[in-house]
C-alpha cells in the first residue's frame, strides 16, 4: 500500500521527461557522468603522490644538524 510500484516510477519518469525534455535530461546525464569520472581521476591522482612523498628512512642521524640545534639552544639561555 505505501510502496511505489514500477508503474508509479514510469509515470514519474514520463512527467519528468515532459517537463524537462529529453535533450535537457541527456545533457544533465552527460554532465553528471563527466563529473563522476573527474572525481575518480582526481582520487587516483591524489593517492599516487602520497606514496612518493614519503621520505626514505635511514638509520643515521646528521650530527652537524644535531650540534647546531644544541648550540642555538645554549645561546638562548
From Swiss-Prot:
Its main location: membrane. Residues 43-77 are annotated as: Disordered. GO terms for biological process: protein transport by the Tat complex. The keyword Cell membrane applies. Residues 64-77 have a biased composition (Basic and acidic residues). One of its GO terms (cellular component) is TAT protein transport complex. It is found in: Cell inner membrane. Pfam families: TatA_B_E. Keywords: Cell inner membrane, Cell membrane, Membrane, Protein transport, Translocation, Transmembrane, Transmembrane helix, Transport. It comes from the Bacteria. It is a single-pass membrane protein. InterPro entries: TatA/B/E, TatA/E. NCBIfam families: PRK02958.1 (NF002813), tatAE (TIGR01411). Belongs to the TatA/E family. The Tat system comprises two distinct complexes: a TatABC complex, containing multiple copies of TatA, TatB and TatC subunits, and a separate TatA complex, containing only TatA subunits. Substrates initially bind to the TatABC complex, which probably triggers association of the separate TatA complex to form the active translocon. This is Sec-independent protein translocase protein TatA. It comes from Burkholderia mallei (strain ATCC 23344).
